[in-house]
């Protein structure tokens, strides 16, 4: 599913930029299904006062009445969508499997492809084959004129180059695969990032017209999965994922620092609460930490939950909501100083959620769930 480290160096060097060019007549749209609100849904966000959710089969749905009724959007894919994010009430992005990035300019009602990950990968495979072919030809020419003392090394290099070319040919002969994207976030109308499996990081500086493979800016030699990205909209950006890995930028993504890990398990989500300038990170076994200095130091947030936390939200003026396995929901009304635990009765796994007007709007297995919360909780 992922290119070899040596191939990644070549790809990073070329800094491949691509613009999706899929034509409308070749697109397969997500089917309109009456039970789509009950399908597996992985993320929820706000587009102004509108709620937008995304999940399996390319399903994106929106609601204008706090989750009571839902309409399906027109979405040109049937791939699993893992994350959805809106910069404002109109413009938003969704990402998912096969390295796909979608964009909407009408509050989530209609979507179009910005980045076709499979097309990107196929083009990359073509370029890798061309590079391998040139390297092989160059070594053959050098070997013909080589002095005896360096022939042995050149012969070994030639054998390696032949194997690289065979690998490149094999990649083109087989169906194209690429890593899924797991999260997306935009600092402003121009600059955005999407992160994913095997250390994938793609960036844009023009609102998504072009996306650039940019893994090389992070010190992630083991290609650990990157599961979550968030920021404050003022230049600070935070990325976290597998094995407790964390990265931070203080200059809008121009440079990145690896933060000292303090936990060996995986982080699945991070949310930023602008109200009190607090960053929260969470993951396996209910581990939850907060930082008041955007990742320089962390403090454990003790709670009654031991289920893995998968996602959540911290929108201005609403409770912080974190959701996870076995129907567990943590919510806070004091800016994250403390959290209350509630359990959804069916105990199915939850992927994310948000709070609004005395309600918890949750997504996960079994689709969308709206639950009332006692008045004193708000």
Task: Locate each region found by the language model.
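Residue-level hotspots at or immediately adjacent to binding/recognition sites across diverse folds
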Residues: 22-378
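Bacterial N-terminal signal peptides
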Residues: 9-18
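Bacterial N-terminal signal peptides that target proteins for export
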Residues: 1-9
């Amino acid at each position: 599913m992922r290119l070899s480290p040596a191939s990644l160096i070549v790809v990073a060097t070329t800094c491949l930029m691509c613009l999706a060019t899929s034509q409308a007549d070749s697109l397969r749209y997500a089917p309109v299904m009456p039970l789509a609100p009950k399908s597996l849904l992985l993320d929820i966000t706000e587009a102004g006062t509108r709620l937008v959710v995304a999940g399996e089969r390319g399903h994106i749905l929106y609601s204008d009445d706090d989750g009571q009724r839902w309409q399906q959007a027109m979405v040109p894919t049937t791939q699993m969508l893992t994350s959805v994010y809106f910069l404002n009430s109109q413009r938003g992005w969704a990402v998912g499997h096969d390295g796909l990035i979608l964009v909407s300019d009408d509050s989530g009602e209609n979507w179009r492809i910005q980045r076709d990950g499979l097309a990107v990968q196929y083009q990359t495979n073509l370029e890798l084959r061309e590079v391998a072919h040139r390297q092989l030809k160059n070594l053959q020419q050098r070997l013909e004129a080589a002095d005896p003392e360096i022939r042995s090394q050149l012969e070994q290099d030639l054998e390696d180059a032949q194997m690289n070319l065979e690998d490149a040919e094999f990649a083109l002969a087989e169906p194209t695969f690429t890593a899924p994207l797991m999260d997306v976030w935009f600092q402003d109308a121009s600059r955005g990032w999407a992160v994913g499996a095997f250390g994938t990081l793609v960036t844009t500086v023009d609102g998504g017209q072009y996306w650039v493979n940019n893994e090389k800016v992070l010190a992630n030699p083991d290609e650990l999965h990157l599961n979550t990205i968030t920021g404050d909209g003022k230049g600070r950006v935070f990325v976290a994922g597998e094995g407790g890995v964390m990265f931070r930028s203080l200059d809008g993504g121009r440079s990145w620092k690896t933060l000292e890990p303090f936990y060996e398990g995986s982080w699945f989500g991070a949310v930023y609460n602008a109200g009190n300038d607090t960053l929260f990170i969470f993951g396996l076994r209910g581990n939850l930490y907060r930082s008041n200095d955007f990742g320089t130091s962390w403090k454990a947030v003790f709670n009654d939950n031991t289920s893995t936390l998968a996602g959540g939200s911290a929108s201005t003026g609403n409770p912080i909501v974190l959701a996870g396995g076995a129907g567990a929901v943590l919510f806070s009304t004091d800016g994250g100083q403390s959290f209350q635990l509630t359990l959804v009765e069916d105990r199915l796994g939850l992927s994310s959620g948000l709070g609004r007007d005395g309600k918890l709007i949750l997504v996960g297995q079994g689709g969308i769930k709206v639950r009332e919360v006692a008045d004193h909780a708000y």
